[in-house]
Curated annotation (Swiss-Prot):
Signal peptide: none annotated. Residues 1-38, 254-280 are annotated as: Disordered. One of its GO terms (biological process) is G2/M transition of mitotic cell cycle. Binds PPP2CA and PPP2CB. It comes from Homo sapiens. Demethylates proteins that have been reversibly carboxymethylated. Demethylates PPP2CB (in vitro) and PPP2CA. Binding to PPP2CA displaces the manganese ion and inactivates the enzyme. Belongs to the AB hydrolase superfamily. This is Protein phosphatase methylesterase 1. The modification Phosphoserine is found at S15, S42. Residues 268-280 have a biased composition (Basic and acidic residues). Keywords: Hydrolase, Methylation, Phosphoprotein, Serine esterase.
């Protein structure tokens, strides 16, 4: 649920489909596995990557909200992971396994409001201020007055929320900040194209396997391993569908509308409702969140983000899928040494899913360089050239 075209630069809300002419290059090459071999698009449970799951209750003026978190690790600093728009905490699954094997740290991957399995009283409020407060409230609920050292790591929308959280001092024990493929300039440029991208996505899927297959073949996620666990957090069963009779019984072809003879409007309306129900039966999965309806918040997530990021008085890391992502403010800041930057080429917008080992290596090196964490085994830091 989140993807954006290269023509939009960084689809700042969801992850974007493959770069024109290349989306197929990496994923397409992997698709051709020889005669008689089929790729496995079946979903994988979160428990293969995280050690535990917890629903954190937070009291606020609107009532009690419940935030889903997935956790791993028992010592070292906490890496608090914030996903992009439309994604969920499960997008960090493969990265979690990779980083835990490199440095001593604890992982807390959070489903932001209206995403994943988090349940809030006011799910329509996706303002940067509200979501930043959510992050602070979850930290307080989990750790009380003595939170451990925490590094915020966010992808796309989650990166913006991480910056807003840091700049508002909502996490008192914050020691570091990492943004993944989110830059104010390119994000703002992409907003005009975002609705067109969202309209171009499938509205429904006939099974979880179908959703996973689409995410990989469209280039939204270029890593099948990650897609098999991540897409489970992006889609849900359509309302009114309690239990499909299994993916094998679901129609494989595309439902085609029959041409109708002229009839009364009442008859047509009745038939349309019946068609909608049939569509739900045959395509029982849809997106968990309608990103198009969050448009009024997009500007608030990203406007002023570069200066907010630069002003945070803590060590900072910026990971990008391409050097062309940098805007003027960040280019100047990078030249002045205000943050560490690393470019991870041959990735789509979902950098941490497409190249989880490379992202884990970059984050682990950052943690060790600043003496925030201890390496595990024979992990060797690889210092980037930029």
């Amino acid at each position: 649920m989140s993807a954006l075209e290269k023509s939009m630069h960084l689809g700042r809300l969801p992850s974007r489909p493959p770069l024109p002419g290349s989306g197929g290059s990496q994923s397409g090459a992997k698709m051709r596995m020889g005669p008689g071999r089929k790729r496995d698009f079946s979903p994988v449970p979160w428990s293969q990557y995280f050690e535990s799951m917890e629903d954190v209750e937070v009291e606020n003026e609107t009532g009690k909200d419940t935030f889903r978190v997935y956790k791993s690790g028992s010592e070292g600093p906490v890496l608090l992971l914030l996903h992009g728009g439309g994604h969920s905490a499960l997008s960090w699954a493969v990265f979690t396994a990779a980083i835990i094997s490199r440095v001593q740290c604890r992982i807390v991957a959070l489903d932001l409001r209206s995403h994943g399995e988090t349940k809030v009283k006011n799910p329509e409020d996706l303002s940067a201020e509200t979501m930043a407060k959510d992050v602070g409230n979850v930290v307080e609920a989990m750790y009380g007055d003595l939170p451990p050292p925490i590094m915020l790591i966010g992808h796309s929308m989650g990166g913006a929320i991480a910056v807003h959280t840091a700049s508002s001092n909502l996490v008192p024990s914050l020691l570091g900040l990492c943004m993944i493929d989110v830059v104010e300039g390119t994000a703002m440029d992409a907003l005009n194209s975002m609705q067109n991208f969202l309209r171009g996505r499938p509205k429904t899927f006939k099974s979880l396997e179908n959703a996973i297959e689409w995410s990989v073949k469209s280039g939204q996620i270029r890593n099948l391993e990650s897609a098999r666990v991540s897409m489970v957090g992006q889609v849900k069963q359509c309302e009114g569908i309690t239990s499909p009779e299994g993916s094998k019984s679901i129609v494989e072809g595309i439902i085609e509308e029959e041409e109708e003879d002229e009839e009364g409007s009442e008859s047509i309306s009745k038939r349309k409702k019946e068609d909608d129900m049939e569509t739900k039966k045959d395509h029982p999965y849809t997106w968990r969140i309608e990103l198009a309806k969050t448009e009024k918040y997009w500007d608030g997530w990203f406007r002023g983000l570069s200066n907010l990021f630069l002003s945070c008085p803590i060590p900072k890391l910026l990971l990008l899928a391409g050097v062309d992502r940098l805007d003027k403010d960040l280019t100047i800041g990078q030249m002045q040494g205000k943050f560490q930057m690393q470019v991870l080429p041959q990735c789509g917008h979902a950098v941490h899913e497409d190249a989880p080992d490379k992202v884990a290596e970059a984050v682990a090196t950052f943690l060790i360089r600043h003496r925030f964490a201890e390496p595990i085994g024979g992990f060797q830091c690889v210092f980037p050239g930029c």
